[in-house]
Amino acid sequence: MAELKNDRYLRALLKQPVDMTPVWMMRQAGRYLPEYKATRAQAGDFMSLCKNHELACEVTLQPLRRYELDAAILFSDILTVPDAMGLGLYFEAGEGPRFERPTDTIDAIKKLAVPDPEDDLGYVMKAVSTIRRELNGQVPLIGFSGSPWTLATYMVEGGSSKTFEKIKKMAYAEPAALHMLLDKLADSVTLYLNAQVANGAQSLMIFDSWGGALSHTAYREFSLRYMQKIVDGLTRFADGRQVPVTLFTKGGGLWLEAMAETGCDALGLDWTVDIADARRRVGHKVALQGNMDPSMLYAPIPRIEEEVAQILAGYGEGTGHVFNLGHGIHQHVDPEHAGAFIKAVHAQSKQYHK
């Protein structure tokens, strides 16, 4: 494997000194880029794009050609794991992801097998190894998965949900069934992430997009407990260096202390969290990633620069901060505004790393 030329992102996650704050964007390979739209049209549909390792590699690299980003993230989807479990994933126009065969009964859950990542998810592994090769040491490659709770919400609900009625009914009326599902998912995600590392991923992120829908105690029981199980089972060293792990619960600002106890290296913050407060609470234990509101990229460029300055000042001096948005970049953002954001982070952060 080629020597890593820019390891700023990995160093910041491990709280090692850096020359400036590293930056990348969730969904940086996405619909706001005209070149992404062209490649997606070539693929035919979203899952065909995910399943073609050459095209998945192409869209992963597209934002790096435009911007001086400090990391690449695998182009894939969190629902690859449930799809490999045989649920029949498809995308409904305007509806988002749906499953032909939801796992909303204990019998359906019992029948689920843990997928073999090299076999059932071989297309993802091929994408990881292709991207790692093509990056040629330019920046590190982030591998990722959804959290067990978040994957379970789609599997039980049969797709996206605003109320999470079916999975919450299962959580409170049939908790043993849900725990069985979450346990299988934790095993599946651990194998999946370790296979990504074996194929070249240099950092890992677990997206708990719907953890914030849970009550205080239910979050620990149904989400955090299973992320903890995954963290305990992950490969944390490869290619002669540490593989940092970031946990991100959207809406999880209440639970930063509990998340920091898992042994992860970093926590992702959404835009509802004050980064200065987060650093006071958990900065002694973990690095922090975030956390500009993605909608701020619609603002005039001087306003974006002002917001960047505010977040950098909030975090303050020293390493342990990876700048990012508080969630994925929106599809209608002007690519020039994204570029101005990235430049602002690099230019304005040097003063905090002297």
UniProtKB/Swiss-Prot annotation:
Do you know which CDD domains this protein is assigned to?
URO-D
> Entry's InterPro entries?
UROD/MetE-like_sf (IPR038071), Uroporphyrinogen_deCO2ase_HemE (IPR006361), Uroporphyrinogen_deCOase (IPR000257)
Q: Which pathway is this protein engaged in?
A: Porphyrin-containing compound metabolism; protoporphyrin-IX biosynthesis; coproporphyrinogen-III from 5-aminolevulinate: step 4/4
Keywords of this entry: Cytoplasm, Decarboxylase, Lyase, Porphyrin biosynthesis
Keyword hit for Lyase: yes
Site keyed Transition state stabilizer: positions: D77
According to the UniProt entry, what is the EC number of this protein? 4.1.1.37
Q: Which GO terms describe its biological process?
A: protoporphyrinogen IX biosynthetic process from glutamate
Reaction catalysis annotation = uroporphyrinogen III + 4 H(+) = coproporphyrinogen III + 4 CO2
PROSITE patterns in the record = UROD_1, UROD_2
- What are the GO MF terms of this UniProt record? uroporphyrinogen decarboxylase activity
Where substrate is bound, by residue?
Answer: R27, Q28, A29, G30, R31, D77, Y154, S209, H327
Q: What class of enzyme is it?
A: lyase
Q: Tell me the compartments it is located in.
A: Cytoplasm
- Principal localization reads cytoplasm
Q: Which GO terms describe its cellular component?
A: cytosol
The record's listing under HAMAP family reads: URO_D
> What PANTHER family does this protein's entry cite?
METHYLTETRAHYDROFOLATE:HOMOCYSTEINE METHYLTRANSFERASE RELATED, UROPORPHYRINOGEN DECARBOXYLASE
Q: Which family does it belong to?
A: Belongs to the uroporphyrinogen decarboxylase family.
Q: How does it assemble?
A: Homodimer.
* Known role: Catalyzes the decarboxylation of four acetate groups of uroporphyrinogen-III to yield coproporphyrinogen-III.
Stated name of the protein: Uroporphyrinogen decarboxylase
